[in-house]
């Protein structure tokens, strides 16, 4: 991964523009555990968002897997996130109506894979949840939910794991177990962790990049990695199975009926007049 001169400014109504990233450049290896450290407002989450294709830069270039993602269309960015990236967030982002196994299977179904139960069981065993496949995620502890989120991120075999404050909602001991797990996976993948916890960053990070006011103020870069091939990869377009989409839609109707009906009405109008 090569990051060259990226900048990002947020324009806010009735307020001064906020410079989130200011001319940032660095290279990252193909494997290892990299921490992006900083206080609130430092730009660390914005950096993760632009590297993962969740947000766009105003200028600069980000080359990943042989492609400059700053030049990709929205559809191509979606394919990049689906194929190249795994995400782990503080809020877990699990679907409560689905079982543990179904939540993990969803990542494979979005890639068009079918009959992949063996992959789900294998990844559950790796994260220490081999007996939880049929459980509802609402029955799990915070640490167990985060392990499910990690399993979902890893099961599709992405190049990079992006973790934004993955231990923020956990107690210290549970947080350590989650970082131990990510550290183990970083032996074969690039794991990028955003955190404000300097102690965890120094203990677990192969490299710690610290931000303040949108700029890099320190970069340990103590460990030198071997950068292997940069061949261009083919990324898969996400495909959500109709039965899963229906289940999620029914759940949304249960909690937000008016919003869902309004969305359906507007969609019908759009398809009718715009095609």
State where each predicted segment sits.
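N-terminal Sec/SRP start-transfer signal
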Residues: 232-270
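Short coil-to-helix segment of the ABC ATPase nucleotide-binding domain corresponding to the Q-loop/switch region
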Residues: 98-106
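Conserved ABC transporter NBD signature motif
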Residues: 60-68
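Catalytic Walker B motif of ABC-type/P-loop ATPase nucleotide-binding domains
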Residues: 161-164
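Helix-to-loop junction immediately C-terminal to a conserved catalytic motif
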Residues: 52
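A short, proline-enriched helix->beta-strand linker immediately N-terminal to the Walker B motif
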Residues: 155-159
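Conserved ABC ATPase signature
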Residues: 136-140, 144-146
